[in-house]
Amino acid sequence: MDKDERLLKIVLRYREELQRKIKERQYEMQQDNNDHYLIYNALGFTSKEGYQIDFQQNVGRFLYKYAGSLLEELAIKCIKEAHPDAKEKVKLPNTIDKSPKTVEIDCLVGKRAYEIKWKDATTDGDHIKKEHKRVKIIKDAGYVPIRIMFFEPNRDQAIKIQAKLKKLYEDIGGEYYSGEDAWRYLKKETGIDLKKLFEKLKE
């Protein structure tokens, strides 16, 4: 089994698990109390439309979660193909304060500590404070923090947050790659064109 086949096997596993999860939720929703449709009706939506909205909202939550987990696992697998000694989910003690007790590195290759995100649309200002603390703990432990985010946000506030995070990483001596730069960086580091694999699946 070559690299692409191993990666494809992971994609198919996630696809099957996601479809199973959606079917389970669909069955659960058929047993639900839908009294809240009364308010949907008042706002101009039929009960049938209300069900579809609720169902798609559930599907959306599952899809978002599985998309993030899939891309993170695939990126780590690519890194491990190139660096068999890479470690996953490495926890470091919080050396700054008591919350949280530990911070996690998604993938560690020597001194290079990878944070992998499929996308990050947060608009929460506290996110920067939390990330600053996390990155400083990693840097103080002797590692180089590297953030790889494959898809960039669309909303202005979220874009501003990411610009601040990029500066944060660079100021502390780390690296930040997003959008096309993230795909290119992964390919350069591992020799695997993960985006091309996804484009093949789309065909």
Q: Model features per residue range: what roles?
A:
Residues 66, 70-74, 102, 126-133, ...:
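Short, well-structured alpha-helical interface segments that form or flank functional binding sites
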Residues 88-108:
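Active-site metal-binding core of divalent-cation-utilizing nuclease and nuclease-like domains
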Residues 80-86, 140-142:
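Secondary-structure boundary elements
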Residues 118-171:
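Catalytic cores of nucleic-acid endonucleases
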Residues 50-58, 98-102, 111:
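Conserved N-terminal glycine/acidic-rich loop preference
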Residues 1-83:
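Interdomain/boundary linker segments immediately adjacent to catalytic/signaling cores
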Residues 150-203:
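Domain-level recognition of nuclease-like catalytic cores that cleave nucleotide substrates
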Residues 79, 105-118:
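Conserved catalytic cores of phosphodiester-cleaving nucleases, focusing on short active-site segments
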